[in-house]
Amino acid sequence: YVKNNAETVDLNIEKKNENADVQVEYDGKTYNDGKNIPVKVGKNYITVKSTVQGENGQTATLTYRVNVHRRAADKTYYNEAYRNQYHYSVKDGWGNDLNGLVKYKGTYHMFYQFYDDTKWGPMHWAHATSKDLIHWEEQPIALYPDANGAMFSGCIVADEKNTSGLFGDGNEGGLVALITADGNGQRIKVAYSTDEGKTWKKTNKIAADWSKDPLNNRDFRDPKVFRWENKWFMVIAGGPLRIYSSDNLTDWKCESTYADLHTECPDLYPIETKDGVKWVLSRGGRSYKVGDFKQVDGKWKFVADEAYTNSDGVMNFGKDSYAAMT
């Protein structure tokens, strides 16, 4: 995305092969240096071709398409006839599942699934911030698709004591994201931010992978992480529910699995009751079970109360209200 006043863009082209012939094409014209490419309001698809000639005389060409979206004037977006004025909505494009709801150093952060179109597509993580949960400011896209696939649902936690070791040798931490990547199977990637969520660095670490799932089920997504008893815990589903644990947010082991308990976007959190702490297992924000989260035979498990063993409570009656997250 570029702002409305950006009439041209420059592409930063870095050759990994000095013998490559790189050409940039847009609207029938060639821009060999990738500089001063004019862009109109809306989507602009710029073609980048990299051609290399081998020793045998044969050539190979790799073609990229770069989508540069020039915004319309800001005043046009939220003055549309049917634009919701009460709830947050994206300026344009697609938005769905909330992926990282976290308050960090006085700022509320909301990350969510996003694609630059009015239909579902390769997902990004978009980002908005607020000081009061009412007035929101859109931030730059946080996470883009990569070689591991699109960036699907996940969560963000504040690793305040640097248990992950991702923030150097000290005890001061930052924000850590656990993200579903969906390329040739679903797996959980790790990213972190050292500047309070403004920019993100993906690690090469795979926190969990469907190929090592004890249930051998390819529906392995939507991680939600929480801190309890000086440990990190992660619920994963998409299909059947699993619970993992970790000391450092990067190395995880499976604690328990629930082959008959299916959901997307799971959440597990404690609530205070007159009888003590109970745990709520949210199934996508539509229904829930109440029970205990405890160790059974040395493994952490969610044990539903008898009243919820074979049935769920109703969390909301609006089916479009989905993928709730604490």
Indicate where each model-derived feature is located:
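Carbohydrate-active catalytic/glycan-binding domains of CAZyme proteins
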Residues: 69-326
